[in-house]
Amino acid sequence: GRMNKWAALACLTRVYLNAEVYTGTAQWAKVVETADQIINSGIFELAPDYSDNFAVDMDYSNNKEVIFAVPYDMQYAAFGQQHKWYPPVANNHFGNFKDYFWGGSCANPQFINAYEPGDKRLEKTWLTGKRYHYQNPEEVVWECINYLPSLTCMRDGENNTNINWGYRVGKYEYNYETTTGQWSNDFAYFRYAEILMSKAEALLRQGKDEDVAAQLVSQIR
């Protein structure tokens, strides 16, 4: 929760990456410079599992990918109402909630289809396919079915209008026991993966070291 040198460098990397948008002058070399300071420190590395970055109880002793996170705790400072944001409105059976979800933002088919077959990030980022009752793994409470050009989430006997369509964000681990929609997941503001991707983009924007850029991206893929 405390900003330090590495969080500051991560912030600079992000600012330099977008410098041309803000000032009209690109700063690709500075992106590489600040990113290299983080990379060469040897402190950070990608988490073994992508989902580790969004767990209810972040284990920072084993997760070296998160450079800076905003801490949240259901008892002292909860990440308020986030559980309600993502699932479709009709799906109030997803957990131990006492009211309905809000049916927040969702992905369109073109974005979902951009994932390559077998890419685990799809299932770890989006609520897709059959979803089961949190206490009964055999009870299907929600199923996403691909009815192009819309991705429709349907449940028998419930409202299946447009407000319930689309794949919802599911990368943050759900606390199925909460009754309020609040959670304790820390918000990972700067991650090592972003630094690798930023350096790769900066190299390509300068027409340099395409092989190095490919290696950086491949670490994440």
How does the language model describe each region?
Residues 1-9, 21, 184-192, 196:
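Extended, leucine-rich alpha-helical cores of fungal transcription factors
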Residues 5, 12-14, 84, 121, ...:
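Basic side chains
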Residues 4-18, 206-221:
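Long hydrophobic alpha-helices with heptad-repeat/coiled-coil character
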Residues 128-220:
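C-terminal substrate/ligand-recognition segments
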Residues 2-153:
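An aromatic- and glycine-enriched ligand-binding surface/loop that stacks and positions planar moieties
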